[in-house]
Amino acid sequence: MTKELIKTEASDHVIQPNNEQFSILEQLKKQQEELLQKQRELFLQDQLAHHQQQQQQQQQQLQFQQQNQLQPANNWTFTQGLVLGQISVIFIIIVFVKFFVFADSSTIPTKKSSIDASGIIVKRNKLTKKDGTSDDIIEDEKLLDTRHKISTILEKTYYDVNNHSPESLDWFNVLVAQTISQLRSEALLGDNIYHSLNDFLENTNIPEFIDKINLTEIDIGDDFPIFSNCRIKYGEDLGRLEAKIDVDLSDTLTLGISTKLLLNQPRPLTAILPVSLAVSIVRFSGCLTVSLINTKDIDLKNIEKDGQENDGSNNENEDGGGTALMFSFSPDYRLEFVVKSLIGSRAKLQDVPKISSLIESKLRTWFIERCVEPRFQVVRLPSLWPRTKNTREPINKKTSVSRSDSGTSENL
């Protein structure tokens, strides 16, 4: 009995570790199965990822092939592209220079109008005549435009025509005196004034009963005119600014002539009457009106036509337009003459009043018809634009510079 009991216990003892091993083996199997399952899953994932990569590569290759089929193959190198770019730039420059800088002469229009310069010249106070506008309205617009220009000039020069005090013009007197002095020197140089007046008298048509006229006395004076009391006024009727200047000249300007009156009745040279005359201007004073005008002015043309002279003077209204200086004297001027006359050879008549009054009347009429208001004189002004042919340089400056250069060279 004891042996059997011992065997049963021993058998139980032997069986029990086998069960534990079995459980351990089962766990190991489960773990192996789990590992195998994980390895299979990882392998499947790797296969799937590899398959996806292959599909992406195939798609990229297909896209690249499609792009290559759509776009032509570009086999240009960098050097070839650079050369092509330089050639294209040079070609563009040549085309620009040819067609934009050097234009063809045949394409340049020969006729130019004021409209071509409308985009270049800044025009202010522009007047345009519209269709259907009467001449009176145009004249009113021009008058308003002129008044606006004058008011702008006075405003920008800070000059009040009503309250500004008169100016003395001392500086202007000096310039006029220098000019007159130079003219006198040129007139007296080589007896130029004598020859000029003598040629004028010889070429003048004189009546048959007057013999040759000879010059006996010429005096161009030694004094100068004095300008003073200058004031700027606005001419309401003319629509322009005028300078009113008082002029005073006290000098002696004398011209003496001698001739003979020929009595040709009843036969030629029946009698000869010598005549000697000397006319002197001793005093002149008056108010001088000076203004700048345009020779294309309509009022100026009408006045010139109405006051056209018969002495062969040139018609300035036929010339082109431009700036001119207009001057005239007021009717209340003062002009004094001294006329000396001597008639006869043996029994002489000296200073005949009738002859003096006749000569003085003729001279006053000549002056009134030309320079007294409403008549005026128009002097066209030359172009003041700087030109090379009018450029001068003092010679003394060059000599002084050369001397200074020579002195410096000697010092060196």
Curated annotation (Swiss-Prot):
One of its GO terms (cellular component) is ERMES complex. Residues 1-81 are lumenal. The chain crosses the membrane at residues 82-102. Signal peptide: none annotated. Residues 389-412 are annotated as: Disordered. Residues 165-382 form the SMP-LTD domain. Residues 103-412 are cytoplasmic. Keywords: Endoplasmic reticulum, Lipid transport, Lipid-binding, Membrane, Transmembrane, Transmembrane helix, Transport. It is found in: Endoplasmic reticulum membrane. The keyword Endoplasmic reticulum applies. It holds the Pfam family MMM1. It is a single-pass type I membrane protein. The keyword Transport applies. GO terms for biological process: mitochondrial genome maintenance; mitochondrion-endoplasmic reticulum membrane tethering; phospholipid transport; protein insertion into mitochondrial outer membrane. GO terms for molecular function: lipid binding. Residues 397-412 have a biased composition (Polar residues). Belongs to the MMM1 family. Component of the ERMES/MDM complex, which serves as a molecular tether to connect the endoplasmic reticulum (ER) and mitochondria. Components of this complex are involved in the control of mitochondrial shape and protein biogenesis, and function in nonvesicular lipid trafficking between the ER and mitochondria. The MDM12-MMM1 subcomplex functions in the major beta-barrel assembly pathway that is responsible for biogenesis of all outer membrane beta-barrel proteins, and acts in a late step after the SAM complex. Homodimer. Component of the ER-mitochondria encounter structure (ERMES) or MDM complex, composed of MMM1, MDM10, MDM12 and MDM34. A MMM1 homodimer associates with one molecule of MDM12 on each side in a pairwise head-to-tail manner, and the SMP-LTD domains of MMM1 and MDM12 generate a continuous hydrophobic tunnel for phospholipid trafficking. The SMP-LTD domain is a barrel-like domain that can bind various types of glycerophospholipids in its interior and mediate their transfer between two adjacent bilayers. This is Maintenance of mitochondrial morphology protein 1. The lineage of its organism: Eukaryota, Fungi, Dikarya, Ascomycota, Saccharomycotina.
